[in-house]
Structure formats: structure tokens, C-alpha cells
Amino acid sequence: MPHSYDYDAIVIGSGPGGEGAAMGLVKQGARVAVIERYQNVGGGCTHWGTIPSKALRHAVSRIIEFNQNPLYSDHSRLLRSSFADILNHADNVINQQTRMRQGFYERNHCEILQGNARFVDEHTLALDCPDGSVETLTAEKFVIACGSRPYHPTDVDFTHPRIYDSNSILSMHHEPRHVLIYGAGVIGCEYASIFRGMDVKVDLINTRDRLLAFLDQEMSDSLSYHFWNSGVVIRHNEEYEKIEGCDDGVIMHLKSGKKLKADCLLYANGRTGNTDSLALQNIGLETDSRGQLKVNSMYQTAQPHVYAVGDVIGYPSLASAAYDQGRIAAQALVKGEANAHLIEDIPTGIYTIPEISSVGKTEQQLTAMKVPYEVGRAQFKHLARAQIVGMNVGTLKILFHRETKEILGIHCFGERAAEIIHIGQAIMEQKGGGNTIEYFVNTTFNYPTMAEAYRVAALNGLNRLF
């Protein structure tokens, strides 16, 4: 690359997408700066999203496990922990992650600049620094990886101390007894699990007719039943008319005429890209109504020297995919093309209690496509390992072509689902006839393990053939 600019490339944002791009660029010898608006690297994933919510979930699930373990069932008092204590656990994990990621940049001599970036022209950024000064930076190319934030409708007062979004909920300073969660997407369902696991009353307001409609319907139904069985009140096909903050909580008026009151509200209905402060109009770029940018297969925007990755380009909005997008964009930026691409079947992990994970097609999709598939199932309660550790709730379902035996989709509900799914994913990615359900029958698994569910499910499915 010519060295007429301050940098070969500037990456805006240090979340998974920005990190993947920055590391990919410096490994190829590029002079790179990463701009981060906050004091610490890691982006929303590390500080407000994936890491803290999963740390909260882990702490709560351990409390549930203790309270339900028959070894301790004769104790007269249940184990409890305050929300503040659980948040402390999340903070410890965040600090570890931040130090580790800061080390990545330092070891690779990648410069970190703090401040808010905005485009001045096609190759120039103005950096508004924390001390009020403004620096001018130039680069031949750019990667926009500035992530997303919770969507804030204008008629909801997020300055009220009892109205939270998925970022501010991590700063809650009171102990809720009853929480309203508006939005039953992934974030809403995960926090419904967390709060209910802490014995907090939960009303989950779903604007659609079922939970997580993109999932295989059996997985969605399993989650709905588990929520119902644990005491979560789910209200489908509802939208708010008005949200009132009051001294002792929040009142929500629904368009159906219902009124709900709780100690606090978590508004978790949508996200928007952090692009509004970038002055993209100065380089001829436009976003959609959600602040997202359109890109091609190499993650180039309408300006060929400007790339975008992660939440700021929308689907799949996963930290795992964002890192790979950044790595691919780095290859394309330096070499003009990339020899890697995102896999077609990206696994989905949803960290409710229990977890849900899936990869490939659902039964509903295969039926609509008129694919002759069969189903193999394994119930966790029949696995020795699950009985030993007390994880009896759950199932693994394998969908496979009844003629070729090719695995078409895998869906798992239960503890460790997000880990278990990768065994099947590895086989699904095999080429030249390697993707076959018969692999699980012909393979010897460690015993007792949760992975054995694949053998049980494979035998169950193959026994259905005639």
C-alpha cells in the first residue's frame, strides 16, 4: 500500500468485527489504527451484550442448580443472591476480557485511539477526543465496525430510573420483585430467564404470535413451555400504547386495553446501528432506517475503499460472525479479494435457561421445500451423563434426508446446547459424502457424555426408515 496517508487502514470500533479486521490487517503488515469511543476496548459485546449477559446467566443457573439439587434438598433455606452480587461477577469477567483484548492490540503493535470519529472527506477522519481536542487522521481505507445500540422509541422516557434498555439494565441499583420485559426476541428471552431464575416475577410482552419464530417450532414451543412452567407470564401479539414511569415503578398501557404495572421495565425491542455520528454523508454513504449499511460479499460499501462489518450491516448480528466478517474484510482490503467466506449454516446460540442452539434447516423449512426428511431424537433424561449431573431437561433433534442420509439440520434444547451443537455442525460441513447421519452410529463416543446424544438420536432416526 502507498504510504501517503497516516495509516493504511483505520478501523472504527473495537468489538468482535473491529478486532477481527484489525488483527487481520496487522498480520498482513498494514499500518492500522483502531478508534474506540469508550475508554476500554471490546465494544458492546464485551461491555453490555454477550459477555455480561452470559456471565449473569451462568451465575443464576448455578443458583438454580444448587436449589434443585437433591443433595441439598433438605436445607431449609434456598440459596439466593442479590442482583448487585451477580453484577459483580459479570464485572469481573468483563475486566478479564478487556485486559486480554487490550493485550492483543499491544502485542501486535496496533494503535488504539480514543474518541468519536466522523468523516471529513473520503480519506480523512476528524477524531473528537475526550479532552475536547480534535485530531485529523488520514487513511487509504477504512473499516466501519461501530456496532449497534438498543433502539429507543421517542415516546419512551429512558431517563426514568425504572426504565431500562439492555445496556442500562447492567447498572440497576435496586432489587426488582417484578419486571416487565417488552420484546421477546433473543435479548428479551435471555433476560426473562435470568430474572425468573432469581425468583423475580416476569411479564414477557411479545409483539408476535410465538417466541423466537425463526427457530424450529419444537424448540420455540419447548422454551414457551419451560417459561410457563417456571412462572413467566407471556403475552403474545401485544403492543404498547403508552409507558408511564411512576415513583414506585412503571405502568404499561397495551393497545389491547390491558394495563400492567411492575417495579421496572426492560425495553428490548430492536437495535439500531451506531452510524448517526459518523457524518457518512460526507463520503456519499447512506444507511437504512435502522442505521445499517449495505455491503457486497467482500464487505465493501458503495464506496469501494470503505468496508463495514458486524452489527452495523445487520444479519446475522452475531459476535462470532462479526469476527469472521472482519477477518474476511481485512483480506479483501489488502489483497483485493478474500479466499475465505462465511459458512452458509451459521450456528445460533440462545442463552436462555436452558440453552437453545441450532444449525441448518428447520422442520418447517424442509416441509415447505418438499424435502423428504426424517427425524432422529434423543431425550437428555435418557443419557447417563445428564442423569449424573442432574440435567434431565432437554432434547437433541437431527433432521436428515431419508434417501442420502445427509444431515440437513440440528436443533438442541437443554444445558450446554451451544457446545453440543458444534459436534453435528462439524459433520454437516464435511464434503464428498462425509456429511451423513451414519457417522454417529459408526463412531465410538466417550461414555458417559452429553455428546452421546448424537448416537442415540442417529439410531432413533435410522430406525424410522423402511
UniProtKB/Swiss-Prot annotation:
Known cofactor(s): FAD
Leading EC class: oxidoreductase
Residue numbers binding FAD: 36-45
Reactions that this protein is recorded to catalyse: NAD(+) + NADPH = NADH + NADP(+)
Subcellular location: Cytoplasm
Family: Belongs to the class-I pyridine nucleotide-disulfide oxidoreductase family.
Function: Conversion of NADPH, generated by peripheral catabolic pathways, to NADH, which can enter the respiratory chain for energy generation.
Record's protein name: Soluble pyridine nucleotide transhydrogenase
Species name: Escherichia coli O81 (strain ED1a)
Name of encoding gene: sthA
